[in-house]
C-alpha cells in the first residue's frame, strides 16, 4: 500500500483549526491544522483523534515518497513537483506540547534574521566536558564556559532542558586507529547514535589511515566505512589537526544548541499562548 498524505476538512466546524492532516507515519498520525499548507508562514497544528475517513471531506490525497521521524521533527516529502517538502516540529512551550508545520520558505519568512548567518561570539554558551577527558579543548577563543561532569556518550556536549542535545567524541589519529582495531569505537558510536545529534571528530587526515604501519593497507579505512554504514547518523569528521578539531567541535555544538532552541520559538505573528489554545 502506497503511503498517503491526506488533507481534509475538520468536521468540528467551530474549531479554530479547520483542517485535518494525515501523516503516513508508523500507524498513522492525525493532526488538526490552521491551514492546508505552510505557504507564507509556519502553520500551528495539534494532535487529533483518528476520524471516520469515510465521512470526512477529503481535499487532497498525495503519495508520500518519504515520511521520517528525526528527533523532534518529522520530514515529509510528497510525490509532486510543487509544495513537495515540508517538516513538522514537535516541541513544547511552558510545559504544553505544540507542533509547527513549515517549509524552507515559510521557516525563513518566520525567522528572517536567520537567513544570512553571521560570525558571532557566544558569550553565555555552556559546553559540558566529560570529567574523564584529559588535555581537552578549552574553546577559549569563543567565550565558552565549560562544565565538567561524566557524560554517558562523547567527550563534549550541549544540554537543553536537562537533556543532552548533541555530543562530540574527540580522537587523535593514533587513538582513532587503535579504537577501530580493538572495537571500542563501535561501542562508543552505538552510544552516540542514541542521542539526537552526535559526531566523532578526528585530529588527523583520512589519508594517514592508509599509511598505518601495523595493519595491512586498506584495513583501517575498511573499518571506518563499516562503522559509518552501521551508524549513518554519527558522522566521522577528519579535521586535520587539534586546532581544527576544536574549531569544528565548537561550531557543531553551537549550531546544535541554536537549532534546538529555535524549535521552541512560537510562530511569527502568533504568540505561543495563542497557538496552544487554538484547538
Regions found by a protein language model. Give the residues of each.
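Extended, alpha-helix-rich binding/interface surfaces that flank or overlap catalytic cores
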Residues: 1-40, 47-137, 145-279
Amino acid at each position: 500500500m502506497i503511503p498517503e498524505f491526506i488533507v481534509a476538512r475538520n468536521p468540528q466546524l467551530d474549531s479554530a483549526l479547520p483542517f485535518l492532516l494525515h501523516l503516513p507515519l508508523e500507524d498513522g498520525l492525525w493532526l488538526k491544522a490552521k491551514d492546508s499548507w505552510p505557504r507564507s508562514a509556519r502553520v500551528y497544528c495539534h494532535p487529533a483523534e483518528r476520524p471516520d475517513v469515510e465521512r470526512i471531506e477529503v481535499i487532497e490525497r498525495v503519495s508520500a515518497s518519504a515520511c521520517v521521524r528525526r528527533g523532534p521533527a518529522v520530514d515529509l516529502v510528497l510525490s509532486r513537483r510543487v509544495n513537495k517538502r515540508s517538516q513538522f516540529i514537535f516541541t513544547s512551550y511552558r510545559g504544553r506540547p505544540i507542533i509547527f508545520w513549515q517549509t524552507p520558505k515559510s521557516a525563513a519568512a518566520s525567522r528572517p534574521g536567520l537567513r544570512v548567518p553571521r560570525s558571532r561570539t557566544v558569550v553565555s554558551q555552556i559546553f559540558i566536558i566529560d570529567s574523564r577527558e584529559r588535555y581537552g579543548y578549552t574553546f577559549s577563543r569563543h567565550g565558552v564556559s565549560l562544565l565538567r561532569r561524566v557524560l554517558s556518550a562523547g567527550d563534549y556536549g550541549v544540554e537543553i532542558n536537562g537533556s543532552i542535545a548533541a555530543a562530540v567524541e574527540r580522537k587523535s589519529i593514533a587513538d582513532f586507529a587503535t579504537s577501530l582495531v580493538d572495537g571500542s569505537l563501535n561501542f562508543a558510536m552505538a552510544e552516540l547514535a542514541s542521542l539526537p545529534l552526535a559526531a566523532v571528530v578526528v585530529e588527523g587526515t583520512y589519508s594517514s589511515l592508509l599509511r598505518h604501519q601495523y595493519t595491512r593497507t586498506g584495513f583501517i579505512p575498511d573499518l571506518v566505512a563499516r562503522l559509518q554504514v552501521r551508524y549513518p547518523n554519527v558522522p566521522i569528521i577528519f579535521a586535520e589537526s587539534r586546532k581544527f578539531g576544536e574549531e569544528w567541535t565548537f561550531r557543531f555544538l553551537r549550531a546544535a544548541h541554536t537549532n534546538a532552541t529555535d524549535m521552541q520559538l512560537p510562530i511569527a505573528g502568533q504568540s505561543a499562548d495563542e497557538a496552544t489554545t487554538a484547538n
